[in-house]
Amino acid sequence: MAKLGLKKLLVTLASISGIGKPCVAHVLVVIFLEYFAWGLLTMPMIATLKETFPDHTFLMNGLVMGVKGILSFLSAPLIGALSDIYGRKLLLLMTVTFTCLPIPMMTIDNWWFFAISAISGILGVSFSVVFAYVADVTTKEERTKSYGLVSATFAASLVIAPAMGNLIMELYGINTVVLIATLVSTSNVIFVLLAVPESLPRKVRSSGLSWKQADPFLALLRVCSDPNILLLCIVVFTFLLPEAGEYSSVPAYLKLSMGFGFVELSMLVAFMAILSISANVSLGSIVKIIGAKKSILLGLFLELLQLILYAVGDEKWQMWLAGNVAALSSITFPAVSAYVSLYSDGESQGAVQGMITGMSGLCNGLGPAVFGIVFYLSDMDLNEDRLLNRSVNEDRTAAGPFMFGAISVFIGILLASYIPDEKTARGSKEEFSALKYIIEMDEEVPTS
């Protein structure tokens, strides 16, 4: 009875009509508020992480983020499939709630905060529902641009949030930052509940759930069905694995190992966000000038450069340079999506994009864990005083995770050089369509 009552309550909440017709702007607000709330906690989380795990800071940071990422990867297809059955609004309400659930725990108990942060990955996958919402309300021609707006909004939320969170923390303490972040996240839940209209009409919803829809590994297994897509997905894996590891560990590394203050770190994050937005906005022009394949290679070279700078740099200006190059290298994944959108037809594009997204989800789980373990093996899980008192020559073990990432990206560059060029890829649309048939029908392409 309680289960039925909860289901009825959720369906009732999801049936609230919202404001206006469903459009991309609705989910842009959701994404901005969600990551603005977490952006406020960037500096407080580093302080809390250091306080809670003083001797294993990098390892525990990697494991917490790794568990969260892996759980998100495992649950994302199920969440997407459920949104096809029950509608986008209900699942968006659930995922936004679970994404923000750990925030107030930071003032209650640090251990519970990190534990719930890790477990929240099960339902904290709002991006998958957001992209489905965007697909509902846009045409195929508008979709790529709209996805870019979602990514740019995510970056925009980080322009001022970390600096603002740090300023509030210094003036009023961590608890005040957590309170404000909680209020922002709560307002986001209320916005979804009252303002976001349903984008998927009942008449076009799925009638049931199959294991194929919920299996996170199915799309990855189907990668082997086409050599070009297999190559593309391996390239994605080689650069997204270290990118995800960096995203989870670099702020703590700069603070605890390189001596960055919270203010300086906030400024760097804001500047990187602005550069990333600019680079992604310019991607369309870059692709038109040099082509999608060369845009991928450009992004990979930039990522290789910034990883080497992090590995060999021992001065703050080198870390600033590495951060700026890292922001510019953020064009790589959108360039891969542009390659797929340009050189596959509309019917096969969704299947191939799904594979690449699945690979991205896998890297978001493995990357932080791998970097955390390599930091630990490199003897970097020390307290802040010991780290800052070590000499530069003594601490070259810090290069370990970044050199690992650089080697991975270098392999990606070698493989990316074999990606079919524009003319060859344009001639492969029938192969892309055949791949879509294999994925969806789970059988070989019929022959005449």
Question: What are these language model-derived features?
Answer:
Residues 45, 125-138, 331-345:
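Intracellular juxtamembrane helix-capping segments at the cytosolic ends
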Residues 116-155:
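Cytoplasmic helix-loop-helix junction between adjacent transmembrane helices
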Residues 90-104, 182, 294-309:
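Structural signature of the two symmetry-related core transmembrane helices
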Residues 2-21, 197-233, 256, 432-444:
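Juxtamembrane intracellular "pre-TM" segments in multi-pass secondary transporters
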Residues 44-58, 248-265:
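Short amphipathic helix-loop junctions that connect adjacent transmembrane helices
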